[in-house]
Amino acid sequence: MLLYSFPGSPTLFYGDEAGVQGFEDPLNRGAFPWGSEDAALTDFFRTLGQLRRTRESLRSGALRYLLARGGALAIERECGGERTVTALNAGDAPADLTLAWDAPTAQDAMTGQRFLVIDGKAHLTLPPLNGVILV
């Protein structure tokens, strides 16, 4: 998620989108797993690519760091009034985040999950090793 949210071109190592894992030579250059790709992971990367393609803020928006605490990080990309916020939890415990938000709800563009906004603040609890892209 972070790779697709930062400025610049997202670049994946060969096979990452299909679940190929890196090993030592000679196994690190094996054939692509055509027909046995990790379908959920491939769909995840496809959704990320579509989101980046349709959100101008992810392609060319200004970057601003909103929060960095423990394993949690939240960044904002903004362009022409379009705002996209990526919030991640790289920690091994749930992370409670509060982010300023100017709409009645915040929606995760990856899953469609909606988060309630109270008094201009979105309140999220991110599970370990998880994240959202809020629009």
State what each model feature region is.
Residues 1:
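Active-site phosphate/pyrophosphate- and oxyanion-stabilizing loops and adjacent acidic/basic residues
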